[in-house]
């Protein structure tokens, strides 16, 4: 909290020719006030001017001004409640400080003029003495009363400013901490996004590998099926080969059987030959016993013919049997040889295919093992990333909860501070109104009949120097009286200033203006049923010389809901579905304010009027 004390000292010394008389009344006047500036410095100004009065006395006036003001920074919290509000307060402070300087200068000039007039107004000494005796005590009482009130007000302002500065510093620290936390949160979100992208890439690689594994498995299954088919073909060919081997064995057995039959038949033939030879011998013996040569010749010829026929028939039958057996045997041997060659070729081809399939299966199994190992590694990496992601999500949720709690706490503190600031602004507004009233009273006092002409005659007219006193001496009305040769005494008479504000609301339809902030922060709309406000316009007229407009964008107001349209300088207070007017820094303030809600056709649907009358 910074305190500035401004002190004006005016001293007067009067010397008369012929005799020295001490001046009666006030030989010095001092005034002090406390304000709250933003800079520090010290100004000392003095002047001395001798003059001669009409009564022949020499008077020397020494006027000195000591101005000191300073600013000190005290620790506190909440450095930035609202940049707009603080700038507004700063501007008002600077304006009030400048007004204080001007008023003090004018007050000093006014006192100087009155001192000059003392030499001219000796004839009024009795009346002034009477006024002094009559009003002196009342002035002291009023002065003490106002000094007590001002001291309490200063203490209250000092305590409030100290608490405000503490809260400002705390707000600054929390805002810095919030910015750091938000930066960490952004970094965490960036890392989270990178992890998400990496997980997506890993999932894509995993999907590709799973697709490749599935394709390899399908290839293995097809190769297994092909192998099974080849095995079935090989088994079938082995069965056929076994069958052919059995057929060959059967044919060999049949061949041996035929050989045996042939040998048997040959033996039987030899036996028949022997039998026939024996019969022939018997017949020959019978023939020999026949004495007839013709009979012997006949039987010999018949027997030879029979033997030849039998021999031819037997040879033909043996040749036929031999040819059939040889043909059948050669056919079977040829078929066996052809089948064995084909089977050998199939077996060789199957062996080559089996070898190739085995090598492919070995390669696929090795690759499958590598892919399974890589898949397991990727799954472990994916699990690790998921765990890290879950951990970061939990941390982010915890930090988010902490941030939300901090923000809620800060908003509560900010609301309380804004409420205090609003109270201070109301007090400040009342002080400004009282300052304006006091200024008018002083101007009226200066312009009383005869006073202005006397001042202009003695010291000359000085324009723009008729306003007096500071914002601290508010709610007061000033008067003056002078007694003695060089004495000035001040009397404060209590005055009052009141402000009366009236509000009037009208609406045509379901939508109405619920509230229009007197400080120009926001305008609140409410509706009794659902209404589409897209294209509607708000027109706010301030003291008939300033117009603020805002066109509502895409907005559908639900039944029973209230929406606030904030000015640009107060958009930090917007919440939820509230709107912000980017075109208007403020909605404006004044004594006569009219807020109108128009639909898209330009028809007035609602009206909110605010009138303030100062009394």
Swiss-Prot record:
Residue ranges of the region described as Linker 1: 136-145
Keyword Thylakoid annotated: no
Stretches for region Tail: 450-615
GO MF annotation list: structural constituent of cytoskeleton
SUPFAM superfamilies: Intermediate filament protein, coiled coil region, Lamin A/C globular tail domain
Composition-biased stretches (Polar residues): 21-30
Organism whose genome encodes this protein: Doryteuthis pealeii (Longfin inshore squid)
Domain (IF rod) ranges: 96-449
SMART domains xref list: Filament
Location of the region described as Coil 1A in the Swiss-Prot/TrEMBL record: 100-135
Keyword Coiled coil: yes
Residue stretches making up the LTD domain: 499-612
Region (Coil 1B) location: 146-284
Family: Belongs to the intermediate filament family.
GO biological process, one term: heterochromatin formation
Location of the region described as Head in the Swiss-Prot/TrEMBL record: 1-99
Segments of this protein annotated with the region Linker 12: 285-303
Classification via InterPro entries: IF_conserved (IPR018039), IF_rod_dom (IPR039008), Intermed_filament_ifa/ifb (IPR016451), Lamin_tail_dom (IPR001322), Lamin_tail_dom_sf (IPR036415)
One GO cellular component term noted in the UniProt record for this chain: nuclear lamina
Region (Disordered): 1-31
Gene3D superfamilies referenced in this protein's UniProt entry, alphabetically: 1.20.5.170, Lamin Tail domain, Single helix bin, Vasodilator-stimulated phosphoprotein
Record's keyword terms, sorted: Coiled coil, Intermediate filament
Record's protein name: 70 kDa neurofilament protein
